[in-house]
Structures are given as structure tokens and as C-alpha cells.
């Protein structure tokens, strides 16, 4: 029973994450706009994913418990490039990419660096969700933001809570997923609220 649940959680998370950002990318392409998408939120999310992936790799945790992160990072990079494209400043992406690539190597130079970064990772990831929430509250329009993407993110956090409890039982990782689950649900609800408000206004 436990092995079956672990298998389902791992593979359903990988399946969901393989297409997680596609609704967001599609919504952005259909709108030909980055309206509603917070650039700081996206950059913070990418930083959080990078730190989390490096931490899991550094400590040799089971590959299936974090295999979705390279997929998520690749999708976030595509999304980020589209945001820069639709905002008319693609060249500004280069310094960010240089920082992210160099960070990958710096994070594993010393154990204390990766441990500190992982503790800050939860704060960084939470800040990315709050940046998106703040932007939605400010513009009161969900624009090209995909509720499906945020809802699927909540699902993956829930499954990762289960897999963490069943494998590594790492408290730092567990706390991160619980906080991210709550915030992803909050963002999803906010996107749906503003979508409903926009429909009523029309």
C-alpha cells in the first residue's frame, strides 16, 4: 500500500510538472502579453527551484523525490523569456541567466552555504508567491495568469508532502512544501476571484 502510494505520488507529480507551466505559457502566447504576470515573482520562483534542486542533489536524496525540478526550471526559463519578450526587453534576461548559472556552482562550494540557502529557499519561494499576490491585488486583474497552473502547483506540493514523509522525512523540506501548498491555494483563489470579477464586469 505504502509503496503504491509513493509510486503514484512520485509519478503523478512528474506527469503534472511535465506540463505545469504550459497553460501559463499558452495563456501568455494567446494574449500576446505578460499582463498579470509578476517578473519579481517569476525570478524568485526560479531562484527557489534552483536552490531546492541543488540541495536535493547535494545531499543525494532519491532522484524521484525531486526529478520534476529540472523540468520546472526549464519551463520557468521559457516563461521568463516570453515575459521579457512581451515587455520588449529580451536583452535584460542575460544578466539574470548569468547569476542563476553561477549560483548553481557557488551553492555547493561549502556545506554551510547550501544549508543556509535551503533555509532561505522557503522564504524566497514564499516571497515569490506574495509578489504575485501583491501584483494581482494591485492591478485587480488576473490577465494572462493561469489558475490551472497555480492549482496544479498546489497539487504537486500536496504530493511532495506525502513523499517527503515517506522517504527523507526532512523537516526543512516538509515545512517548505506545507507553506507553498497554502500559498499556491491562495494565489489560485485570487486568480479565480479576479477572473470572476472581470467576467461580471463584461
Swiss-Prot record:
Positions of transmembrane segments: 33-53, 64-84, 94-114, 171-191
Protein name: Solute carrier family 66 member 3
Subcellular localization, as worded in the UniProt entry: Membrane
Topology relative to the membrane: Multi-pass membrane protein
Highest taxon above the source species: Eukaryota
Residues in the signal sequence: 1-19
Pfam hit, one: PQ-loop
InterPro entries: MannP-dilichol_defect-1, PQ-loop_rpt
A single cellular component GO annotation: membrane
Keyword line: Membrane, Signal, Transmembrane, Transmembrane helix
Claim: Cell wall biogenesis/degradation is one of the keywords in the record: no
Amino acid at each position: 500500500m505504502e509503496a503504491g502510494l509513493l509510486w503514484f505520488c512520485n509519478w503523478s507529480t512528474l506527469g503534472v510538472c511535465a506540463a505545469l507551466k504550459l497553460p501559463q505559457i499558452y495563456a501568455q502566447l494567446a494574449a500576446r502579453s505578460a499582463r498579470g504576470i509578476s517578473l519579481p515573482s517569476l525570478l524568485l520562483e526560479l531562484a527557489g527551484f534552483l536552490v531546492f534542486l541543488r540541495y536535493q542533489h547535494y545531499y543525494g536524496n532519491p532522484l524521484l523525490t525531486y526529478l520534476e525540478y529540472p523540468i520546472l526550471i526549464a519551463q520557468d526559463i521559457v516563461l521568463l523569456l516570453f515575459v521579457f519578450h512581451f515587455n520588449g526587453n529580451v536583452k535584460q534576461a542575460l544578466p539574470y541567466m548569468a547569476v542563476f548559472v553561477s549560483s548553481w556552482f557557488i551553492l555547493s562550494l561549502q556545506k554551510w552555504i547550501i544549508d543556509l540557502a535551503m533555509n532561505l529557499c522557503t522564504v524566497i519561494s514564499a516571497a515569490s508567491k506574495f509578489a504575485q499576490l501583491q501584483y494581482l491585488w494591485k492591478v485587480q486583474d488576473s490577465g494572462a495568469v493561469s489558475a490551472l497552473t497555480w492549482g496544479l502547483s498546489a497539487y504537486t506540493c500536496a504530493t511532495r508532502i506525502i513523499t517527503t514523509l515517506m522517504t527523507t522525512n526532512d523537516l526543512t523540506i516538509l515545512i517548505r512544501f506545507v507553506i507553498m501548498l497554502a500559498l499556491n491555494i491562495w494565489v489560485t483563489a485570487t486568480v479565480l476571484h479576479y477572473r470572476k470579477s472581470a467576467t461580471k464586469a463584461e
